[in-house]
Amino acid sequence: MSLFLPKNPLEVSERVLREKIQSADFLLSDEKCSHRLVGLRYDPSRMKGPEVAVVCARHEMALAKQIALSLGKKMYVRPEFSAVLFREYYCGERLAPKDYAAAAELYALFYRNREGTFPRA
């Protein structure tokens, strides 16, 4: 049995982080963009509600911001909501109904600025 071990483990973590950030519709951060970064994704045709695409903490922030900027991801400064998401959810977990209103507000802003149209379920 062959086990693939990368020469540089950081390459793997950077690739995984890039894939997770790329899968997010947009990102939320604290006011200084230095403590936490949380990404949300939602596809109404196949999901019951928004889910957390990526969660980054302090030690990943520099790389995560660099990746997000290179991908052209929209970042919103929402300290309270990003703290709730960071504290209560894991990557890949669907949001609880109690957080739908805050997420819907951000999605409305995101789609209004993006295309002026909303996705249909």
Give the label of every model feature segment.
Residues 1-121:
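Divalent-cation
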